């Protein structure tokens, strides 16, 4: 994870920041970071889609996503390309890591006291792989964008 001073960014924020540092993302700004701040831990700590995957998907959206100024055909083509790339990202992550949800990746439900205790214990022992997920997601997103690393 990326840290700046005492601030430690979550998996989603860290993934977006790493991708933006490697290849400037169009439209990446404080508002994107505000959105990403709620996607760590599988969306607000809920255990859903891994924040690293969410961050990479957001980066793909910034590059290939739609806005309200395209003609219908261009809108549809962009949407199709973005979804194809994002699904490739998600399939590859699940293939490499066996799960795509934080709950499965961590092996515990951090929304329960028992799960939170297990998570804290694994974190203290350095058994979490979240930094690896962030690095993987950055590499895969750049690969999908055809950016040389």
What are these regions (language model features)?
Residues 26-44:
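Short, hydrophobic/aliphatic alpha-helical segments
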Residues 6-12:
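Thiamine diphosphate
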Residues 12-22, 57-59, 74-149:
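Amphipathic alpha-helical interface segments
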Residues 19, 23-26, 43, 64, ...:
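A broad structural signal for alpha-helix termini and local helix breaks/kinks
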Residues 1-6, 39-48, 76, 122-126:
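A short glycine/serine-rich beta->alpha loop
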Residues 51, 56, 60-66:
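Catalytic phosphate/nucleotide-handling subdomain of diverse soluble enzymes
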Residues 32, 47-52:
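Active-site nucleophile and cofactor-binding loops and adjacent substrate-binding regions
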